[in-house]
């Protein structure tokens, strides 16, 4: 979210900056260190799921994904490409799906975790839809945006984390002047 730094996972390391996304394999010690100024990271793991199901993380070297780094500049380029291509009425929304070579077939970053960056054009809406699993979202930019979840309006706020329960019918709306 803010700052820059370095992350070490096992024998690998990446240097990251504001807006970058990275995926780390389990089973390794991980160290995050800011460079000069304070950094803020938004971290999502499948550790709660593993604990709930009474499972252990993978053994060292047996993780279902590798260390992956998606720089903000490449993410921006891909989002712009999505807007260039456009979308038809049959498409629920515009999303950049992140995956890894090990999870490419399922379009996930982990066997049970999908990572996507959704975007709505100014004045746009995403039709009502539902997911079979929970959706955890980080609002990056959302002035005058909101979601309708099971008929209830939820206004967006920058850097807020939202949780949409499984099978809840929901839609997203941008009444602002910029894409979200």
Where on the chain are the PLM-derived regions?
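Exposed loop/turn and edge beta-strand positions of beta-sandwich/beta-sheet ligand-binding modules
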Residues: 111-114, 133, 166
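A short, N-terminal "cap"/entry segment at the start of jelly-roll beta-barrel domains
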Residues: 51-116
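Extended hydrophobic/aromatic segments used for targeting, binding, or gating
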Residues: 143-180
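Short histidine-centered beta-strand/loop micro-motifs
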Residues: 33, 107-108, 125-131, 137, ...
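A short beta-strand-loop-beta hairpin characteristic of the jelly-roll/cupin
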Residues: 1-18, 130, 134-158
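Ligand-binding loop in jelly-roll beta-barrel domains
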Residues: 13-20, 26-52, 166-180
């Amino acid at each position: 979210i803010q700052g820059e730094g370095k992350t070490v996972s096992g024998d690998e390391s990446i240097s990251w900056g504001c807006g970058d996304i990275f995926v780390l394999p389990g089973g390794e010690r991980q160290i995050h260190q800011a460079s000069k100024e304070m950094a803020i990271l938004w971290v999502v793991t499948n550790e709660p799921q593993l604990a709930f199901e009474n499972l252990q993380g993978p053994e060292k070297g047996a993780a279902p994904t590798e260390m992956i780094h998606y720089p903000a500049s490449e993410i921006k380029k891909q989002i712009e490409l999505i807007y260039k291509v456009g979308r038809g009425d049959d498409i629920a929304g515009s999303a950049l799906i992140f995956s890894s070579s090990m999870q490419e077939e399922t379009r996930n970053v982990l066997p049970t975790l999908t990572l996507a960056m959704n975007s709505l054009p100014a004045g746009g809406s995403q039709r009502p839809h539902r997911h079979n699993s929970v959706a955890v979202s980080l609002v990056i930019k959302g002035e005058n945006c909101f979601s309708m979840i099971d008929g209830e309006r939820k206004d967006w706020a920058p850097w807020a984390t939202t949780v949409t329960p499984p099978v809840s019918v929901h839609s997203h709306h941008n009444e602002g002047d910029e894409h979200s």
